[in-house]
Amino acid sequence: MTTQTLAFEIGTEELPAFDLHNATIQMDKLAHAAFEEAGIPYGEISVYSTPRRIILIATEVPEVTQALEEVFKGPSAKIAFDENGNPTKAALGFARGKGVDPRELERREEKGVEYVFATKRTPEKHVVDLLPTLLHGLITGLSWPRPQRWGTGTDQFRRPVRWLLALLGTNVVNVEFAGLCAGNTTRGHRFLAPGPFTVAHADELLGVLENAYVVTSEAKREEIIRQQIKAIEEKTGLVADLPEKVMAEVVNLVEYPTAMVGTFDELFLSVPKEIIVDAMLVHQRYFPLFTKEGALTNKFIVTSNGNPEFEANIIDGNQRVVAARLYDAKFFYDEDLKKPLEAYVDDLENVVFQESLGTTRAKVSRIQSLAGELATQAGLPEEDITDAKRAAYLAKADLVTSAVVEFTSVQGIMGSYYAQAAGETAQVAQAIADQYRPRFAGDTLPQSKVGMCVAAADKLDTICGLFAVGQGPTGSSDPFALRRQAIGIIAMLQAGLAISLQSAIDFALDSYCSQGIEFDKAEARAQIIDFFVTRTKVNLKDSGIRPDTIDAVLAAQVVEPAVIIARAKALESARSTEPDTFDDLATAFARANNLRNEEAGCAVDESLLEQTEHALYNAITNAQEKVNEALQTDDYAAALQQLAALRGPIDTFFQDIMVMDENLALRENRLKLLNLFVSVFAQVANFGLMAKSVK
């Protein structure tokens, strides 16, 4: 069968970088699905994109589809036809669902039962007749965050579509969209080779574009940019800051990338480096250059989409842009320094934290008290408690400074600089800088316990407040990023912030009550604790802990995230690396748990115990004491060792003692002994939930 290559290009005005990346992924999925649905075979589908185009290439597309004959088994003939042989609703529905005439249904016997069958025949079709609808569907099937309409038409796309190319081999496919008819012409780089260019065959499209200074592969453009930056680094002896997110955006801002080095006046290096880096990366998509020791220099890399022959002009234009940004930054910074950071705190009265929860100034009062409470719980010295409260008081002040209003991503960082300039302690300044950490899973934690107290107070205040007013996460919706903030708190608890989360939640909710916020405290508290437990479960699953291990620990009514994680990891370790220990734990628990009777209680009458029972009783009470000691010091491995040591006594007990004795007093006392045995295990975890792994 003769096959051809299909080339389809949607030419547009410049598409937003991240939208373009998402559209490329969508197009690949849509194309595969569309070809399958249309019954069009193909060899390989590839999608390419640049800021001005989305391209689909499908290889080995046949001229005609294959004729198909599909046979479907339906209901039994007894159900499908009435006594007069007329089709029933069951037969009619079956035929309709398979797209056949009820009169075409056939009866066939299968294993002694007669059924009806439908044969659906799809004739071969000319692919060129199917493609217009298919390709039009690909255009309209793309989902955009904010699609546009242009001209007088009603068609929508992320940016206006300016040309369409659709070729099956040498033949133009008659696709229409937004008043445009597809042809065999494309356009090159906007400045270096605008075109138009005729494409004689679908196989030639990518080559034509390459000759017209268009690098159609996103991966290839990134490779070119990285190679050029590496060459600059080797030549200058400097190191570029290349955040993945910014690189991904830059790659989709250019069709023919050229990396160039620009400079700015060293005078601007007196401004905090974070502002300069923010101005470059976030606002201009330039890559700042640092010394190998990590010091920011006055050099940066700009990735141009223009003609490399005019490098001097391009660099000069970009230097003018960055100079203007940095002049503003320096002006804002200098103006902000004219007042001490503390002077900005009361201005937070004009900043709304959340509609139902009042102002950011009210939040500052809450987190100041909560940070002091957390520092006290953590056993920090008095001077650290004072620093925690001071840092919390000043933490949000930079939100109303000019520099942060203009460069929002440096909030907290600028507050730290302003705190240093105002003579605050180094620990206070650092805690202000660290208040938003960790910002995501795996991010750096605050440097000190004081910083952790401030960061945890801020996050917990937000979580408690939003749950209190019914704004907690629902399903996949988490507009206030509460899950991320909970993960941050859990990470700090794991890192040794020795506080009671339950107590901290109570304190935070009480602070809202004292400020006149009305809500059901008991309900909010329960929801918040459940929220943290759920986040902890996700944390453990992501780290490879088995679900039944997690459930076993949670069944012990543990709610403190750090305790849940430590116990689960100790138990998982015993299961994975100490199989003998776990076997002893599981076997001992299972034997006792199979016979225990919760209604009997645990009040053992020692006067009724025989020698073997006494031995078990003494082993239990001894283990109970040592398990309690181990739990008090968070030594969960030691607690498990103590429980595992009970296997010998319980095995001997079952060998020598008849639990279900005819003497009811002895029977009940022995059941109480087993209940006591199980209760010691239950302090750590419910080993019964791992029953499948016990064998």
Language model regions located:
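Amphipathic alpha-helical "coupling" segments that flank catalytic cores
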Residues: M1-K695
